[in-house]
Structures are given as C-alpha cells and as structure tokens.
C-alpha cells in the first residue's frame, strides 16, 4: 500500500486528498477491502485526511463503516482511540446493512445471469 502511495503521489502527481467520482478518498480505500492500518495512520497522523465520517456518494460508506464492514478491528480500534469514539451509532449500522443488501443484490443478479446462460 505504501508503494502504491509513492506511485500515486510522486510519479503521477496525484494529491492524497484526491476524491473519486463517488466522493471516496484514500482514507476510504485504506479502510476498505485492502485494510491498511499503516496507511490509515499515515493519512490521519499527518492531517492529510482525518474525517472518518465522510460519506461516499455511492453507498454512503464512511471510512469507519468500511473498516467495520471489512472486519478491520485494528483500524476500528485505532479510530476509537484517536477520535474518542465510545460507540457506533445506529446510523453507522444502517450504512453497513445497506452495503450488505447491495452486495447481495449484485450476487443474486450475477447468479441469475449465469443460470439463464446455462439454460440456453
């Protein structure tokens, strides 16, 4: 992940504060599927990206809900300590539930497509 950071920042000249089309940023990526506590700490400790409640527009994911969704306990624990979080709100859980529903719909649509293809 740090090598990717070097590539993006130094070789391509893309700022770390760059946002994707859906509003996600490097902190969202670091808390998502790849889950890199090292990257999260780098972004937060250097005050590059510190808003753990910033929503992406596609699913409404925040870095915190992504870390919870992808089971990155180390990142969640770091956020709890760094930002003095005492509990996860129902609103955060709703975002996670919406993500699960969306993933299920995608899986169901893919499964249905392949079932239809095998009937032809």
UniProtKB/Swiss-Prot annotation:
Superkingdom: Bacteria
InterPro entries according to UniProt: Ankyrin_rpt, Ankyrin_rpt-contain_sf
ANK repeats mapped onto the chain: 22-52, 59-88
Keyword terms, alphabetized: ANK repeat, Repeat
Pfam families in the cross-refs: Ank_2 (PF12796)
Protein name: Putative ankyrin repeat protein RBE_1215
Source species of the chain: Rickettsia bellii (strain RML369-C)
Organism classification: Bacteria, Pseudomonadati, Pseudomonadota, Alphaproteobacteria, Rickettsiales
